[in-house]
A protein has these predicted regions:
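Predominantly long cytosolic amphipathic alpha-helical stalk/bundle segments
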Residues: 26-112, 116-130, 159-193
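Hydrophobic alpha-helical transmembrane segments and adjacent short intramembrane/lumenal linkers
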Residues: 129-144
Length: 193
């Protein structure tokens, strides 16, 4: 049962870290786009890059990469934004495979506890030489408790996992939408091939 508890602690720690990271990665993209456009109008690409540099989050990082390649034309900017968007998406999804692993192994560890509990019950019956309800009940109790604990851990971690996935999806949709808006803004301001 202590192994299941460790699984829960590690899974919960990773989930909490991801939630904090994702909350810090969330940016008001409309406001950022407006700041970048204003900076671009007044000071060019360098001023717009400075706005991105001073803003946290994946959207600002993607914008910075695109603006950094602005002298090479809009096609290169677009490819840079798409490529770096994939990098940022990987950073957002970091650690999810561990949470998924803990979700999968927690019930298995619980079932392992069930088997161990049943073996202990049969050992107790064998040593006593007769079948007593108290001997069987002790082993079955251990079996049921470990199974229950494994299932509870998996359910809790699954809830966190699904919340994190929905948060990542929301950020990715905003990244994609904002990237299109950045490209449109640059085309509007005369950036050509």
């Amino acid at each position: 049962m202590s192994i299941i508890l460790l699984t829960f602690i590690f899974g919960l720690a990773i989930a909490i870290e991801r939630i904090i990271y994702l909350n810090l990665a969330t940016t008001n993209t409309e406001k950022l786009l407006q700041k970048i456009e204003d900076a671009y109008k007044s000071g060019g690409a360098d001023a717009a890059k400075e706005v991105c540099r001073n803003t946290r989050g994946p959207v600002a990082s993607i914008f910075y990469q695109g603006l950094d390649r602005i002298s090479e034309g809009i096609d290169v900017v677009e490819k840079s934004v798409i490529s770096y968007g994939s990098v940022q998406m990987g950073l957002l999804e970091q650690g999810l495979s561990w949470i998924s692993l803990f979700i999968a192994i927690a019930p298995m560890l619980g079932f392992l506890g069930t088997v161990i509990g049943m073996i202990q019950a049969f050992d107790a019956i064998q040593l006593a030489g007769d079948v007593s309800p108290q001997l069987v009940a002790g082993g079955i109790k251990v079996a049921l408790i470990t199974t229950l604990f494994g299932l509870i851990v998996a359910i809790i971690l699954q809830l966190f996992y699904n919340y994190i996935l929905s948060k990542i999806d929301s950020i990715v949709i905003k990244m994609e939408d904002a990237s299109i808006s950045l490209i449109d803004m640059l085309v509007e301001h005369g950036i050509k091939k």
